[in-house]
Amino acid sequence: MKFSILSLAVAGLVGLAKASVSPVHVDGRYFFYENGTRFFLKGIAYQPNVDDSDTEGTLFVDPLSDGDACSRDVPYFQELSVNAIRVYAVNASLDHSACMQAFQDAGIYVLSDLAQPYEAISSSDPTWTVDLFSRYTEVVDSLAPYDNMLGFIAGNEVIQNNTNTNAAAFVKAAVRDVKSYIKSSGYRQIPVGYSTNDEEVTRDPMAYYFDCGDDDDHVDFYGINIYEWCGDSDFVSSGYQERTEEFSNMTVPMIFSEFGCIEVRPRTFSEIVALFSDNMTDVWSGGIAYQYFESENEYGVVTVSGDSVSTLTDFPYLSSRYASVIPSASYESTMSATLTATMSCQATNSAWMAATSLPPTPSEAVCECMDSTRSCVINDDVSSDDYSDLFSYVCNEISCDGITANGTYPGQYGSYSYCDAKQQLDYVLDAYYSAKGDCDFSGSATLVSASSATGTCASYLSAAGSSATNAISLTADSNAVSRNSSASTMSTSYTSGSGSSNSSGSSSNSSSKSSSGASSYNLNMVITFLSVVIGGTAVLFI
């Protein structure tokens, strides 16, 4: 009889909570539910294989666009005791409501990367452009309205070793601008973070680089794709103790944004016991097991064929591990002394050469203004494949500092470094024409009647200076990256970055929201109870 009463109680609580999921926010170095209970991720990577797509020429499959598929997978997530998924690429133009609702009803939160395979900050030739900013904000717009949207990832393993640390400045600029966009758009303060590889030389300086500086610039959380624990390892020999000690001074939440070594099969996921133990939870807030779908890399825990799902050997191990761990309950109201902290940016060294001066916020209005006032421009029939030869020739003859983007310390960013390739080529061709009086380039360019710069456009050009190496301070509304924006009509509702510097430390509570505790006893009970049922952190006290 007691079991029957408990079953009814569970069903009632789950039914009551099904209609609403408590948004999760960041306060200092931890995630919290709205009621102040600490949140831990028991997650899994969720990105379908392109080979499984029915659409010819598909670059990636949006895992949040197929409501039937999401509903199909929810019971398996529940069997795994998963409370979060990570998706790596979404199509912002598609409808995500069915999937997000299915996951919300199941108490599952979503962590989404902002990039996609062919729209991302490059490791080898990093830039932060109008087009990339537009892509990232479109993803924000498509997912931010949902209460179970846990956070956005501005880059995944962009910095791979000490040879391309310059790329970090561009990722951090993306973090800054997406955070500003979320705020100016009136969304709740959804965290924006970065996910890195576990590279020995850059591991420490990279983490502190993304954590340091002004609240507006640094990440809200930091993830490491970590595969150090293989087979039946332990807290010490796996390297987990070292990693935990290394990051004990981080001021933002730390997660394993991927984990699950496959060197020993089957994977028993014994690292989960350590990750959610008191040895690690002071620093770490859970993680994302890699991965749900089986693929050629053999990390999956299920195979999918149409509506049919078959669990693989690793599935029950992951399920039992997640179900068995319940971290010690902790609350925002009792942790206030540990939440406020600052992180000053460190000096560069041979392992870390990223500039603390960040690229400016991309502005389409500035680019259109500049381009409309050029007299010597590239012909429309010239293929973009031929642009590189023209850039090479012109930039060997005159300075191209106005379009330069260099994230190596101390950082150098031309006024038009974020414009598209055609606009940048128009700029340097016109500069060459002004210096040498030639605008032919073997028939590739032509003279046109340039527009006169007036009003706001004139102020942009003046701020850039004759060499176009000055930062252009501007304000822009939340549609500053829209393809329909214009320099003459741009409104002024938020301040954009203009080659900002991260030289000073600051509080890391930019993404926090004040918690007033539980709004009622019943809501607090439901959220706390569900956190145990679906993989959260608290223990239900009655």
Curated annotation (Swiss-Prot):
Cellular localization per UniProt: Secreted, Cell wall; Membrane
UniProt binding sites for (1,3-beta-D-glucosyl)n 2: E157, D198, R203
Protein name, per record: 1,3-beta-glucanosyltransferase gas1
GO cellular component: cell division site; cell periphery; cell septum edging; external side of plasma membrane; extracellular region; fungal-type cell wall; new growing cell tip; old growing cell tip
Membrane protein topology class: Lipid-anchor; GPI-anchor
Entry coiled-coil feature ranges: none
GO biological process: cell morphogenesis; cell wall (1->3)-beta-D-glucan metabolic process; division septum assembly; establishment or maintenance of cell polarity; fungal-type cell wall (1->3)-beta-D-glucan biosynthetic process; fungal-type cell wall assembly; fungal-type cell wall organization
Chain residue ranges for the region called Disordered: 490-515
Task of the protein: Splits internally a 1,3-beta-glucan molecule and transfers the newly generated reducing end (the donor) to the non-reducing end of another 1,3-beta-glucan molecule (the acceptor) forming a 1,3-beta linkage, resulting in the elongation of 1,3-beta-glucan chains in the cell wall.
This protein's record includes keyword Disulfide bond: yes
Intrachain disulfide bonds: C70-C99, C212-C345, C230-C261, C367-C419, C376-C439, C395-C400
